[in-house]
Amino acid sequence: MNIWHDIAPERITAKSFEAFIEIPKGCKAKYELDKDTGLLKLDRVLYTSTVYPANYGFIPRTFADDGDPLDVLVLCGESIYPQTLVHCYPIGVIKMIDGGSLDEKIIAIPFGDPTYHSYYDIQELPKHVFEEMMHFFEVYKSLEHKTTTVKEICHRDEAMDIINKCIDAYEGIFTSGKGKKRR
């Protein structure tokens, strides 16, 4: 089984989706999906003293501009174990430049999380939560002599547009009309 591909399409929509967690909140290890096997592999350990400020993973059945599944940060009161599916809704998106290329990261919240369930747009987040995420993405690769820049923060509607775009890209590349459409 490869979670990127082997999940029912109806479970992945712009308003409600399963996020696959690769990295728990508070971790310095950068795990990522091995696209061939569907397993997690250790990509690297972060060089800086920063840790992931939120649970980090991807949205299955999506294909982003960087050639990977669409990234997602899942804000939750708890660290979530890697390889866990989390039913989420989007509240915004961080658009960054990473290595000269656009890299979009959806910000999402699990349905029913008692800490974050009252937030529906990124602008509603407490200032510190928001600033901690921005700081992380501005410095997490600095000691590797790589540059990342937060370009723009967008609201829920833009996040849903990006998710739809990445679902459509996935369907165009991987299903070629053979699979069930999500709409």
Region spans (language model):
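Hydrophobic N-terminal alpha-helices or hydrophobic patches in metabolic proteins across all domains
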Residues: M1-R183
